[in-house]
């Protein structure tokens, strides 16, 4: 038997996506995580990749739709992605779009040892990558950064 909240969320997401020329590829609902997690994968019709802007715009629309529906009466985490959207952040636009998102940074230190740090993307300037690690801003020189990858806060 299907969960009625999941069924309603799928209908809301599909209708919201269709209005923007998108379709929902997959919707996952995890009521056991704190906060509740809703993961939605979208793509353009017919089966074309979406841009980061498409994901951001859909996130705003579906968030508002869920709030108005009153289906979920407690805090929740909404994750929007695409089956074809890469996890690596590379362009200035990527870094602006995903400000505040969880990331993992692979970088080298002064001894050329590879290290990783995880936190929330704060900013990428001309000189540094700034990440928020438990409320503290950590600066990593941009020339030391090897990769910056989006991660899921749900593991």
Curated annotation (Swiss-Prot):
The keyword Cytoplasm applies. One of its GO terms (cellular component) is cytosol. It comes from the Bacteria. One of its GO terms (biological process) is translation. It holds the Pfam family RimP_N. The keyword Oxidoreductase does not apply. It is found in: Cytoplasm. SUPFAM superfamilies: YhbC-like, C-terminal domain (SSF74942), YhbC-like, N-terminal domain (SSF75420). Keywords: Cytoplasm, Ribosome biogenesis. Gene3D superfamilies: RimP-like superfamily, N-terminal (3.30.300.70). Its main location: cytoplasm. Belongs to the RimP family. Required for maturation of 30S ribosomal subunits. This is Ribosome maturation factor RimP. The gene is rimP.
């Amino acid at each position: 038997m299907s969960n009625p909240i999941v069924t309603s969320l799928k209908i809301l997401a599909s209708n919201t996506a269709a209005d923007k020329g998108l379709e929902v590829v997959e919707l996952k609902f995890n009521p056991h995580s704190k906060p509740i997690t809703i993961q939605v994968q979208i793509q353009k019709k017919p089966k074309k990749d979406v841009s980061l802007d498409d994901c951001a715009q859909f996130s705003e629309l579906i968030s508002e739709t869920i709030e108005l529906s009153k289906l979920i009466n407690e805090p929740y985490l909404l994750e929007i992605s695409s089956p074809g959207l890469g996890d690596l952040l590379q362009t200035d636009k990527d870094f602006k779009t995903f400000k505040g998102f969880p990331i993992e940074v692979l970088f080298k230190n002064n001894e050329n040892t590879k290290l990783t740090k995880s936190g929330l993307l704060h900013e990428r300037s001309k000189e540094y990558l700034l990440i928020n690690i438990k409320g503290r801003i950590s600066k990593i020189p941009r020339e030391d950064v090897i990769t910056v990858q989006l991660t899921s806060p749900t593991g």
